[in-house]
Amino acid sequence: MMKAFLVLDNGTIFEGESFGYETESVGEIVFNTSMAGYQEILTDPSYCNQIITLTYPMIGNYGIHPDNMESSKIQASGLIVKEYVDLPSNFKSEKTLSQFLKEYKIPAIQGIDTRKLTRFIRTNGSPNGGIFVASEYSPSFLEKVKSFPGIINADLAEVVTTSSKYIFGTHTGKKFKLAVYDYGVKTNILRLLDANGFAVTVYPAKTPSEEIMKEGTDAFFLSNGPGDPAPLDYAIASTQKIMEKRYPLFGICLGHQIIGLSLGKKTEKMKFGHRGGNQPVKNLETGQVEITSQNHGFAVIDDQKQDEPISFLNLNDHTVEGILKSGYPLLTVQYHPESAPGPNDSRYLFQKFYDLVEKTKKG
């Protein structure tokens, strides 16, 4: 294996071995605490411009299978692990993780003290950094890392969105048409919307909402996606028009944040975000605690408006996980009820949204 270097923007250098494509890449360094699901994580569009540290110490054990793709390709800029396993034990595996990374020209580094790196991120926040495959260190590596602009105020949704609208699943026998705004939508979200009875049509992020309304839809869904919601002026404007017309609306992750901004709330960059499959969230309506899958680095700030109460609350740091609007058919969650990977505690929300649409249409 070739030697590789992980370089952080403060000058910290980690030396390891390459097991991906022999290239270099820069991005925001983040960590995910999930014990499994590396293929779903790597192909999640929400990781655009990010290099992922997996805290579980042994990665690659079960290989790669097409059914576990959350988009058409690897979306992350790189992968950092403690130990890579090149001999997967899984009857469904079709290739190794290393082969998968090389197929999409993504660098990866092993032999890193991921515990030390994760503790650094928790203390100092998510740094910019880069993976460089080379026989020896060069000062130019740090220069390239420092030239990375970061993800704040960057419109990454336009990078990962579909280039044209398309139908997902089948529309035959479906009662309600659902327009999905693709800001980086995961495939399992679309699967569950389809499975719960919606006739799903997916639209590019910048499609004017008036255009979709003219085509005809019963409800709107705002998808997950990467980065900072604040620069997505077009998405905020479309959402405000959707709410003016009182269409039922469901937002997950970035979609939840866009709805928050559309209501006049503010968002903030988190120190190191929530990424993993074990975040406890309390449903404030039922009092039930759900273990959730999450992947975000920004959060909606609670402005304590009485007619826009918090519906879900993170029990680790008390960040907003969902908001309501009095008298409006709205459902939002910061976390990922579709999991992939992660627990299935919150999958009922897809049926809940269907019931909300049905109730709204009945008047």
Curated annotation (Swiss-Prot):
Q: Pathway membership of this protein?
A: Amino-acid biosynthesis; L-arginine biosynthesis; carbamoyl phosphate from bicarbonate: step 1/1; Pyrimidine metabolism; UMP biosynthesis via de novo pathway; (S)-dihydroorotate from bicarbonate: step 1/3
PROSITE patterns, per this entry? GATASE_TYPE_1
The highest taxon in the source lineage is Bacteria
Active site: residue positions? C253 (nucleophile), H336, E338
Catalytic reaction equation(s): hydrogencarbonate + L-glutamine + 2 ATP + H2O = carbamoyl phosphate + L-glutamate + 2 ADP + phosphate + 2 H(+)
**GO: which molecular function terms?**
ATP binding; carbamoyl-phosphate synthase (glutamine-hydrolyzing) activity; glutaminase activity
Q: Which GO terms describe its biological process?
A: 'de novo' pyrimidine nucleobase biosynthetic process; 'de novo' UMP biosynthetic process; glutamine metabolic process; L-arginine biosynthetic process
User: What Enzyme Commission number(s) apply to this enzyme?
Assistant: 6.3.5.5
Residues annotated for L-glutamine binding in this entry = S46, G225, G227, L254, Q257, N295, G297, F298
Stretches the record annotates as CPSase: 1-173
- Cited function: Small subunit of the glutamine-dependent carbamoyl phosphate synthetase (CPSase). CPSase catalyzes the formation of carbamoyl phosphate from the ammonia moiety of glutamine, carbonate, and phosphate donated by ATP, constituting the first step of 2 biosynthetic pathways, one leading to arginine and/or urea and the other to pyrimidine nucleotides. The small subunit (glutamine amidotransferase) binds and cleaves glutamine to supply the large subunit with the substrate ammonia.
Protein name stated in the entry: Carbamoyl phosphate synthase small chain
Gene name, per UniProt, is: carA
